């Protein structure tokens, strides 16, 4: 079947509607025939279904690929993903998100598409704002959002990305105690044995320095300080104000306030939040800890990122792979003017 390359589309005659669209749902019917996207046309040419001409000259697969790459950004990446999905048995159509994918056993006209697929090279940065907008747009129309990443060897990795609203099950975010604590170099120590035990056993705050004293992280300390649970003094016994604590903590760790915002949101929603250093993340998060003698596995790993953050996909891939390998969900907490928003990213098989 002869077709014509025009701009970023390939045009076929009316006979293509019956042969290509009604049997395989390729392209979009028009009054005068069928309009194919460049990836659809390249796939059909690869399968020997069509011939493509440009200004009277027949294009072989190489010539078409070169022309398409000039006419459409990321063409080769999109072709790799499109061909992979087709060979997995999916009906795939181009869309604003790159592709919409229909459930197995279904097709256009039988049911709605289930998945939006966005395609990127492993080398391309991904602004978190763009990612959030894309995910929310998909969820607003009840679609699953999949990010297809093509590495330098043209292997594919698929990630499901969705918004999240994690809810913990701790009955109270902190026990009803009040005690003094001292800000040392980069952590805080509570000295009272009874209060230390209550904070550790009742809310899994900090780590016991010994049977009587509790050492607290900076974010834990500010959270308890803000609720009147601890009074924080410096090493000369001067009491800190809230702003003074924030200033000193921010000198120690430049991202302190951002981390604290996520810590506060997670604690306020009923979680137990501990450092995620051993996993290379900011936090590991538990839905509920009933006993410090029998601590369960954490549910999430959380990285806190600013609203103007750009994902580097190899870094994102490493974080997600580690989280999935230890049976945890990887959440990215995006800083907002008030609170945080979460993106849940996991590796999936198509």
Swiss-Prot record:
Q: Please name the GO terms of the biological process aspect recorded for this protein, alphabetically.
A: tRNA processing; tRNA splicing, via endonucleolytic cleavage and ligation
* Residues of the signal peptide: none
Q: Which UniProt keywords apply?
A: Lyase, tRNA processing
Q: Which Pfam families does the record cross-reference, listed alphabetically?
A: tRNA_int_endo, tRNA_int_endo_N
How the protein assembles, per its UniProt entry?
Homodimer.
The record's function comment reads: Endonuclease that removes tRNA introns. Cleaves pre-tRNA at the 5'- and 3'-splice sites to release the intron. The products are an intron and two tRNA half-molecules bearing 2',3' cyclic phosphate and 5'-OH termini. Recognizes a pseudosymmetric substrate in which 2 bulged loops of 3 bases are separated by a stem of 4 bp.
Q: What's this protein's name?
A: tRNA-splicing endonuclease
Q: State the species of origin.
A: Methanosarcina acetivorans (strain ATCC 35395 / DSM 2834 / JCM 12185 / C2A)
The gene for this chain is endA
